[in-house]
Amino acid sequence: MQAQAPVVVVTQPGVGPGPAPQNSNWQTGMCDCFSDCGVCLCGTFCFPCLGCQVAADMNECCLCGTSVAMRTLYRTRYGIPGSICDDYMATLCCPHCTLCQIKRDINRRRAMRTF
């Protein structure tokens, strides 16, 4: 009788990184406020509320929807080109516009059933 060689498992079966995101673009421009006036008004007059909505949409807690990290997470999740530096500069220069852009993008991806 032959002894069987031991099998060494180096990775857990069925667990690993998910599929790579497909390349896409933002659904609307950063200053494309008139494509969804409700989001624009909410971002202008109740910025913290919109930040909480975005955070909740992304299953995050607190007001981190307004942060560079949230924008970077969203961009990388959907394969949107850019860099952390781009996200930082956009969020620094116009936080209202960037937050509204993320919320419009979420709404459009939901409508397309890709969110």
Curated annotation (Swiss-Prot):
Protein's name according to its UniProt entry: Placenta-specific gene 8 protein
Q: List, alphabetically, the PANTHER family matched.
A: DUF614 FAMILY PROTEIN-RELATED
Q: Name one GO biological process term.
A: response to cold
Q: What does the sequence similarity comment in the record state about its family? A: Belongs to the cornifelin family.
| NCBIfam families cross-referenced by the UniProt entry | A_thal_Cys_rich (TIGR01571)
Q: Which Pfam families match?
A: PLAC8
* InterPro entries xrefs: PLAC_motif_containing (IPR006461)
Q: Which domain of life is it from?
A: Eukaryota
What does the entry list under GO cellular component? Answer: azurophil granule lumen; extracellular region
What GO MF terms are annotated? chromatin binding
Give start-end of the signal peptide.
none
What tissues contain this protein? Expressed at high levels in plasmacytoid dendritic cells. High expression in spleen, lymph nodes, peripheral blood leukocytes, and bone marrow, with lower expression in thymus, appendix, and fetal liver.
